[in-house]
Regions:
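Cytoplasmic/organellar membrane-interface segments at the starts of transmembrane helices
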Residues: 14, 136-137, 143-150, 204-245
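Hydrophobic transmembrane alpha-helices and their helix-loop junctions in integral membrane proteins
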Residues: 1-173, 177-203
């Protein structure tokens, strides 16, 4: 009876995660519209609080990445990762009054992040559906037990980390480049870019940790598991987008 209740609870959380993933694109579209309104308002009102926003961006990136490093649940890791990604997007807000490239980078990263994070949550939901759990321990040997899910999840994680040539690399490159290029206008632009690069490197720690579980460790049960077909179809589409987007 307790086992049945546990499985029902897990199934409920899986449905919640899929719902979150489906809504990610809509939320990112709203975020993009908000960015446009804020930037236009800042320029129109001649508000010079961009340095404060840059500090908040650094704090947000660092807080999200450090928080993710100490989690033991994959959805929690992804949630803290989203905080860090919001910090990267804020770089564009801080630099937008000085660089069109910065605003372009933010909007580009919002679009990429919607795909990357949705795919990551769907992969986590697929694992939870098949293995009835969210703990990192469930991911031991996943590369052999659920190979398609593991590959799609790995590509999502690498894209979130900004590893070339995936789509996350290119939007981060635009953002970080904006920081470097505004050095003659605002002294802190290059330092903001450096902080972002260091945080991207830090994020590799927990992304690689998950991938190590999937490919370099073995669980007590290494038998193949049936992968949810509906989720696999979405993951494959997202995987193609993340790779193909790098060449656009």
């Amino acid at each position: 009876m307790e086992m049945d209740q546990s499985l029902l609870s897990d199934a409920g959380r899986v449905r919640s995660d899929v719902h979150v993933a489906r809504r990610a694109g809509t939320k990112k579209a709203g975020f993009a519209a908000a960015i446009r309104v804020i930037v236009i308002g800042m320029i129109a009102l001649n508000v010079h609080w961009t340095f404060t926003l840059a500090i908040i961006a650094i704090f947000t990136m660092t807080l999200g990445n450090l928080g993710a490093l100490v989690q033991r649940s994959v959805p929690r890791i992804l949630a803290y990762s989203s905080i860090a990604q919001a910090g990267y997007i804020m770089i564009g807000l801080a630099l937008a009054p000085y660089s069109d490239q910065a605003l372009t980078g933010s909007l580009f990263h919002i679009m990429n992040h919607a795909v990357m994070k949705s795919a990551a949550f769907i992969a986590a939901a697929a694992v939870a559906t098949a293995l009835a759990g969210y703990s990192l321990e469930r991911y031991r040997g996943l590369g052999r037990r659920m190979p398609i899910t593991a590959i799609a999840f790995s590509i999502s994680l690498l894209a979130l980390a900004g590893v070339p040539p995936l789509n996350g690399f290119w939007s981060k490159l635009v953002l970080f480049g904006a920081g470097i290029n505004t050095g003659e206008t605002v002294w802190w632009g290059p330092y903001l870019a450096i902080a972002a690069v260091l945080n991207s490197a830090l994020s590799l720690g927990y992304y690689a940790w998950i991938m190590r579980k999937m490919y370099m460790e073995e669980g007590s049960d290494m038998s193949r598991v049936k992968e949810p077909r509906s989720m696999i179809a979405v993951l494959v589409f997202a995987m193609v987008f993340k790779i193909g987007r790098a060449h656009v």
